[in-house]
Regions:
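N-terminal, active-site-proximal structural segment of metallo-dependent hydrolase catalytic domains
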Residues: 5, 19-83, 94-102, 176, ...
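Bacterial N-terminal signal peptides
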Residues: 6-16
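Active-site beta-strand/loop signature of hydrolases that rely on acidic residues for catalysis
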Residues: 27-34, 55-80, 107, 145, ...
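Solvent-exposed loop/turn segments at secondary-structure junctions
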Residues: 34-37, 72-76, 94-98, 112-113, ...
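Second-shell loop/turn segments in exported
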Residues: 40-46, 64-66, 131, 160-168, ...
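Structured beta-strand-rich core segments of catalytic domains in phosphoester-bond hydrolases
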Residues: 66-157, 260-262
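Metal-dependent phosphoester/phosphodiester hydrolase catalytic core
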Residues: 137-141, 148-172, 176, 184-185
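Metal-dependent phosphoester-hydrolase catalytic domains
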Residues: 146, 169, 173, 180-191, ...
Length: 300
């Protein structure tokens, strides 16, 4: 199948990056809901096999150094890793703690970061084994990693999650739980939190995190923003919303220099050969933030 990859307005972020020197202490964070592979999407022209090369090209083009994913099934994550030389990932399946079900995997460049430790917990009052928490309709999992930036020796934690899409209490309790875990694991070490939170910037569960004094939304911290759309598109290239349900939060030791909702699309040639249909790589737009190491970083 012939692909024409069309870089949208989000290309400006990469152009801006190219205008400044590439210092070792700077890197790009991403969060990307990949949309789980299913037959229904394939029947409507949005199958994973079709989308995978576009997503991989998008990640390479925007030069994600480390990024959280949501809804990735094991075979999807293996395929994405194979399509991204120089990257690997951590994370387990939410259904059995092994490979079954959706993952909240974290991908990272192996030449830039050394993995020091990692783990997973369920968004539940029983976080150490597969289960559904509170009023959630599905099991939900958070994956975390402790990383060292190789060139500087700086150490940080990254947490990545996917909150429930139905349970209101589950989302609020999940926000409290992840903040508790961040404080427990990091002990003052700088932290990144990414994910599909299934709530936008007006919701109480979002505010629990953003007003916690532990983390802040990169959207609010960035002097340069390119957010011409929200983050859930439902596979509609022409959709428009101001609602951002996919977020990147960082602790105070990071300096954020840019933020973007990446609205890139691609084109598929129809059978007639005379018309092209715009497609989004997933039913969510990925989010990217450029950050720098600031005060409070140390090597371990």
């Amino acid at each position: 199948m012939r692909y024409l990859f069309i870089i949208g307005a989000a290309v400006l972020l990469s152009l801006i990056s190219g205008m400044t020197p590439a210092y070792a202490q700077r890197f790009n964070i991403g969060t990307y809901n990949l949309r789980y592979a299913n037959h229904g999407d394939s029947m409507h022209g949005n199958g994973w096999g079709q989308r995978l090369p576009v997503i991989a090209a998008q990640i390479r083009f925007h030069d994600f150094d480390i990024f959280g994913t949501q809804e990735g099934l094991h075979h999807m994550l293996e395929g994405l890793r194979d399509s991204l030389p120089g990257y690997t990932y951590i994370g387990i399946g939410r259904d059995d703690g092994k490979t079954a079900g959706e993952h909240s995997a974290i991908f990272y460049k192996t030449g830039k970061f050394k993995l020091l430790d990692h783990g997973d917990f369920w968004l539940s009052d029983v976080p150490d084994r597969p289960n559904k928490g509170w009023d959630a309709v599905l099991p939900r999992i958070c994956t975390w990693g402790k990383f060292r930036e190789i060139s500087t020796g700086y150490v940080f934690y990254m947490f990545n999650l996917h909150m429930d899409h139905i349970g209101v209490r589950a989302r609020a309790e999940s926000a409290k739980l992840v903040l508790l875990k961040i404080k427990e694991f990091s002990a003052g070490t700088p932290v990144i939190l990414t994910g599909d939170f299934n709530v936008d910037q007006t919701n109480e569960s979002y505010r629990l995190i953003n007003e916690s004094g532990v983390l802040r939304d990169c959207y609010e911290l960035s002097p340069i923003r390119l957010a011409t759309n929200g983050t859930f598109n439902n596979f509609r290239a022409d959709g428009k919303t101001d609602s951002r349900i996919d977020h990147i939060f960082v602790s105070k030791q990071f300096t954020v220099d840019r933020y973007g909702v990446l609205t890139d699309t691609y084109r598929l040639k129809e059978d007639t050969g005379n018309k092209y249909t715009a497609r989004t790589p997933s039913d969510h737009f990925p989010v990217m933030a450029g950050v720098e190491f600031g005060k409070g970083f140390r090597g371990r």
